[in-house]
Amino acid sequence: MELKKDSNAVAIDMLLIVHSEKRRAAQATHLDPQANPGALLQNRGGFQGVRNGIRKWQELEENSFQGNLPEKQCLQQPQVITSYDNQGTQLTVEIHPQDAMPQLLKKFSLAKRLQGDKNGNMRPRQPGGKDAHAYPWDRSSLKSMPLDLRLFEKLDASASQVTVKSGLNELVSDLLQEAHSDLERVRAIWIWICHHIEYDVEAAQEKDRQAFKPTDILRTQKTNCDGYAGLFERMCRVAGVQCVTVPGYSKGFGYQTGQSFSGEFDHAWNAVYLEGRWHLVDSTWGSGLVDTTTSKFTFLYNEFYFLTHPALFIEDHFPDNKNWQLLKPPQSLRQFENSMYHKSEFYNKGMLSAHPETSMIRTVNGKATITIESRAPTLFMFMLNGKQEHGLLSLRKNGMKLEVYPPTMGTHKLQIFAKGNSEIYSSVLEYTLKCNYVDFSVQLPSELHQPVGPSWFSEQMGITKPSHSDPIIHTSDGRCAISFSVEEGVSVLASLHGDDGPITEETQRRYIFQLNRGKRTELKVQLPHAGKFALKIFVKKRQEQGNFIFVFNYLLCCANTKVNWPMFPESFGNWGQDNELLEPLSGVLPANRNVAFKLKLHGIAKALVKGQDTWPLTLNPEGYWEGSCNTAGCQEVYVMVLENANHNFYSYILKYKVNDQ
């Protein structure tokens, strides 16, 4: 007991109810005769072995009951009479310890919202049938209740700017200035915590440093998951909204695909009661993330964990009490461990499903196939054991298909990333691959990047109507021709890559000869030898600065060991986009031979071939420049043009080499 300066004021750590004699009689009829009316509420330190400090938080929460313990763990509660109509007046006096928060019963009508049990104990009700959502997810919404997030824009902006002036009571009061419903009250609290409370990575490793008291959390603005959940619950109670803290297992920081869970709980989150049903929130994961490499926290707001649909929430949250799954039917711990973990970005970026639906995949004949369905076109990439190798990823209008060929037997880690409108790829799925057979006939080039084959993305970048829609092209003689339409103002560049060559940037382009016929572009390809090659396609808008952008590639396959094609002639800057070379296509000419030339050149006055001597080319009626030259005594042969008839300066446009005699 502490006496204040005012002699009429007394601070007592208990709940005092003052009522009339009539009310005493009414009270006597409701009290359990076996109960000890003078017993104080005991500490709820019943979660043995909880690593993240839920037990400590509960010890600080005297005079509260969350209703999320199994029945056998519920402790004896004191009997409290809440109201008796027409039986006199009732005065309730609440006196709190220094670190506790007043409930503001009158201002926010908390007493009307909290539901009592048959004995009059005020506590949130346990979830029941009307709270349960069907499992599996019906794809209707990411939320457990209809929401239009645009209606929260003003409230979110206001709540995120509120600062702590004194204590939690005033903070909640400031937050609720723009809130006019329980949903808006919860939203304001959620936004404030997610934008102001930092996850304390260091304290997570040192239990003695963890902050559990609201005063400590507000002062340092740091805590751990149990602190987030406890603070969220206390703020909701001050705001007059039923809220409980739910402990359990999670697939969060440090989770390994396929791992099992036992022993201590490693996480805590909340359930809030809105519009007659319970809903789930996780303000820890809504506030940001911890970098796995640096172990540093970064604020990165995640809307996904606000009123998450329970059928999605169960993918990474398993509560201690199955009732708090809010699912029908509830899932077992074994199902939780074995189920596919779709990360929040999977759903944030509009994806619907993935196949296989288990986190562990066994290869079949050395191959594993993964497909993803999405609501809209999405960019994907993958990494196998940390490298973008040994797979073929093709984009579809509503998803993607990935074929993976592990290079060795054993266990492999497969990560899949997706990209929406932002410039950053986010991890959305992780699989563990078990490979007991390697198909050595499938040796993909290390430079084969993703995606393979034309798609909606190549159309978006200006390449349409491809001659080859399949990403894999087989050629028996080592040659192929690929064509597609190109939007006006778009330039195309191609290069050939193989593990055994070509090597230099020049040779990567010299096995491809590009022809432009109106709006169609044709790529003539000659392979230097048998094997598998990546034909990369790049584009660039001519009016924009910067480099060419990779769009997609083809996989070229040739099993003919006799293939040994030379490079195409080297072209120079004056070789126009619309020029066309018919012959000779080989970049190496035979020695001591007459060689015919035929080209279509635009905007020139004269053309000639220069070797040991000079041979002019003439323009025929079809618009082709024709002629021939003799390679005797030549090591190199050039095609040259005169663009202006009033000048005498010729420009090099093509260069050939001549075989040694």
Curated annotation (Swiss-Prot):
InterPro entries listed in its UniProt record: CAP/Cytokinesis_protein, Ig-like_KY, Papain-like_cys_pep_sf, Transglutaminase-like
Location(s), subcellular: Cytoplasm, Cytoskeleton; Cytoplasm, Myofibril, Sarcomere, Z line
Q: Which UniProt keywords apply?
A: Cytoplasm, Cytoskeleton, Hydrolase, Protease
- GO molecular function annotations of the record: peptidase activity
What tissue specificity is annotated for this entry? Specifically expressed in skeletal and cardiac muscle.
Read off the Gene3D superfamilies from this record: 3.10.620.30
Map out region (Disordered) in residue numbers: 116-137
Q: What is its EC number?
A: 3.4.-.-
Q: Which SUPFAM superfamilies match?
A: Cysteine proteinases
Q: Where is the active site?
A: C225, H267, D282
Q: State how it assembles.
A: Interacts with IGFN1 and FLNC.
Print the miscellaneous field. Used as a marker for 'occult' heart disease, as its absence does not cause heart pathology in heart.
- Role of this protein: Probable cytoskeleton-associated protease required for normal muscle growth. Involved in function, maturation and stabilization of the neuromuscular junction. May act by cleaving muscle-specific proteins such as FLNC.
Q: Which family does it belong to?
A: Belongs to the transglutaminase-like superfamily.
Which protein are we looking at? Answer: Kyphoscoliosis peptidase
Which species does the entry assign this protein to?
Mus musculus (Mouse)
Q: What gene name does this entry carry? A: Ky
